[in-house]
Amino acid sequence: MAWDNIPVTPELEELAQEVRAVCFGSLAQRSEVSRNTIRRFLEAVPRREDTLIVFDVNLRQHFYSHEILEESMQLCNVLKINDEELVTVSDMFGLNDKGGADDREICRRLVRDYGLKALILTRGVNGSYVFTPEEESFMPTPKVIVADTVGAGDSFTAAFVSGLLRGFSVREAHELAVATSAFVCSQDGAMPVLPDNLLRK
């Protein structure tokens, strides 16, 4: 896989100085070479007030570890996770060691413990949450005829980040993310052309 050997280049180091948002995941960090490059890139990104560094947990098979997840959560300021991944992370990090904590409590704890600007929790047909230090936004999942769920999570994240970069409130960015993800699920393929009503939002 190409992402198993991402080298550090002068172009990459220069790009790190210019980005307003960057998204990374756990799978591309399965090789030491790419993991080191990703870490160096993230450490080079200037920590401006509006810079978004998004960690999409994106657990796949056995290609993750406590160390990779811990370091990634330390480096990000926005965390994207789904309900199944939250169970795994919660167990791995002992976030529900006394039992009884619900998903929302665990998410609020992650926001607090890692100093996050936002945490996105997607729950499939059961809706989605966005948590920040100041607020909590819930939105139900729209009912659509599902053609293909590939790309649903990525489109959600991309739309949410795009909204924040354009000055949307957390709630407005959340609404855009939900609408975009629902549309993607109704289309074949991971990258359908978005309709004008979404592009104009």
Task: Please give the residue ranges for each predicted region.
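Structural alpha-helical scaffold elements that stabilize or flank donor/cofactor-binding regions
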Residues: 14-15, 71-72, 112
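Distinct, well-ordered alpha-helical segments
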Residues: 35, 63-72
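Non-cysteine beta-strand/loop elements that form the S-adenosyl-L-methionine
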Residues: 76-84
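Active-site beta-loop-alpha junctions enriched in small/polar residues
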Residues: 27, 58-60, 84, 124, ...
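Conserved phosphate-binding/catalytic loop of the ribokinase/pfkB sugar-kinase fold
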Residues: 1-36
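Short, well-ordered alpha-helix to beta-strand connector turns
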Residues: 18-19, 76, 116
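Conserved phosphate-binding/catalytic region of the ribokinase-like
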Residues: 44, 93-201
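Short beta-strand/loop segments at the ligand-binding rim of alpha/beta enzyme cores
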Residues: 48-55
